[in-house]
From Swiss-Prot:
Its cofactor is Co(2+); Zn(2+); Mn(2+); Fe(2+). Its EC number is 3.4.11.18. A divalent metal cation 2 binds at residues 219, 288, 321, 416. It catalyses: Release of N-terminal amino acids, preferentially methionine, from peptides and arylamides. This is Methionine aminopeptidase 2. Binds 2 divalent metal cations per subunit. Has a high-affinity and a low affinity metal-binding site. The true nature of the physiological cofactor is under debate. The enzyme is active with cobalt, zinc, manganese or divalent iron ions. Most likely, methionine aminopeptidases function as mononuclear Fe(2+)-metalloproteases under physiological conditions, and the catalytically relevant metal-binding site has been assigned to the histidine-containing high-affinity site.
Length: 435
């Protein structure tokens, strides 16, 4: 989920653009080798032609029967607690820290011991990440042009509920509203219940999915297109995100990550309908660190050089996300709001009405400080809540997050991973075979 930053515009760092760019995927992507299966043949028996034909016919009937049977045995999605009954979930991709001063961490027994003490904490993230991988695989297979945004959101969110095996949102489940931002809309759009938008073949959709287990949030996103003319835009953003992941680590300055991301992102161009566009970083969107039940926990990870000398620290969790655009490279809030979150410091704030009080109680009971959308309120049984909700926003009790948009007619893309800064190595916990 994107972190937006307000302030003065910054001139993009000038970088020579090239069409051939070193693929940073080689630093972090685990490529699975193709398996080769050797077959051995039994010595062929000599049979009469009529017997051979009869045996082939029998074999064919049996194969057809097996095929028919296998179609009926389609696997049904179940809670991962049944799949991983021992509570040990797949680890993410491990990476060394980039700085030489951190090289000792890999072999330091004390650091590894401290890491083991937080094993339950890490298992929550790994479970959330495995849910995320399965949900996005299903989404990538099933999302097609012609589907409504509501159908797509339901597909993703119901899959999260199935794989976590729990509809109690505070224990585990959806980490934040499913982002389905289209084209020039970069972030913070999910359909409200009256939404009629239909996905089109020419759309560029950012799919931003959050899964949490006991408040430990996995935040990861990809961009879905059906027309390959956008490939260079997607490649630029994906490689920029990989660069951010590679550069991140304990004691790394946030500015240095932003500078590296910008250099990669802005070395790309994309040709759309005969016109060439430079790919720009959206300079006021950032990655962020993640706290327990808090998606944006204070630090922001820039995607351009911005002079921030703040360092990443041991034990922190970060969402490394980058946004590229064919537009201005700067987003503004615009459009009907769907994303909200309860502010953490509301003790002593006078609530404006009895309806507002009951709505705050419902929000606390169902979401705590996790972000939510209007559809989730309705699922929790709330109706006729809009007036009270707007009162809470004006009172500063609830924060609203409207859609963030670049220039109309432009195209934006996003990729994102969650990383865990262990004492000895970093873990790209959301890494999968897809990205």
């Amino acid at each position: 989920m994107a972190s937006a930053q307000t302030g003065t515009e910054m001139s993009p760092h000038h970088v020579t653009r090239t069409y051939k760019h070193e693929n940073f995927l080689s630093f972090i992507s685990t490529m699975s080798e193709k398996e080769t299966v050797e077959t051995t043949q039994e010595p062929k028996q000599v049979v009469e032609p009529t017997q051979e034909l009869e045996e082939l016919a029998i074999d064919g009937d049996q194969a057809a029967a097996k095929k028919k049977k296998s179609k009926k045995k389609k696997k049904k999605a179940v809670s991962l607690d049944k799949t991983y009954a021992d509570g040990v979930f797949p680890e993410g991709q491990w990476m060394e820290y980039p700085l030489e001063v951190n090289s000792y961490r890999t072999t330091d027994e004390e650091k590894r011991y401290l890491d083991r003490q937080q094993n339950n904490h890490w298992q929550d993230f790994r479970k959330g990440a495995e849910v995320h991988r399965r949900v996005r695989q299903k989404a990538q297979q099933q999302i097609k042009p012609g589907m409504t945004m509501l159908e797509i959101a339901d597909l993703i969110e119901n899959s999260i509920r199935t794989y976590t095996g729990n509809d109690h949102t505070l224990k585990q489940g959806i980490g934040f509203p499913t982002g389905l931002s289209l084209n020039h809309v970069a972030a913070h759009y999910t359909p409200n219940s009256n939404d009629k938008v239909v996905l089109k073949y020419e759309d560029v959709m950012k799919v931003d999915i959050g899964v949490h287990v006991n408040g430990h949030i996995v935040d990861s996103a990809f961009t879905l297109t059906f027309d390959d003319k956008y490939d260079n835009l997607l490649t630029a953003v994906r490689e920029a995100t990989y660069t951010g992941v590679k550069e991140a680590g304990i004691d790394v300055r946030l500015n240095d990550i932003g500078a590296a991301v910008q250099e990669v992102m802005e070395s790309y161009e994309v040709e759309l309908d005969g016109k060439t566009y430079p790919v720009k970083c959206i300079r006021n969107l950032n990655g962020h660190n993640i706290g327990d039940y808090v998606i944006h926990s204070g630090k922001t990870v820039p995607i351009v050089a911005n002079g921030d000398m703040t360092k990443m620290e041991e034990g922190e969790t970060f969402a490394i996300e980058t946004f590229g655009t064919t537009g201005k490279g700067y987003v503004i809030p615009q459009g009907e709001c769907s994303h909200y979150a309860l502010n953490q410091d509301i003790d002593g704030v006078k609530l404006p009405s009895e309806r507002a009080k009951s709505l705050v109680k419902s929000i606390k009971d169902n979401f705590g400080t996790l972000p939510w959308c209007r559809r989730y309120l309705e699922r929790a049984g709330e109706d006729k809540y809009l007036l009270a909700l707007n009162q809470l926003v004006r009172a500063g009790v609830v924060e609203d997050y409207p859609p963030l948009v670049d220039t109309s007619g432009s195209y934006t893309a996003q990729y994102e991973h969650t990383i865990l800064l262990h004492p000895h190595k970093k873990e790209v916990v959301s890494k999968g075979d897809d990205y």
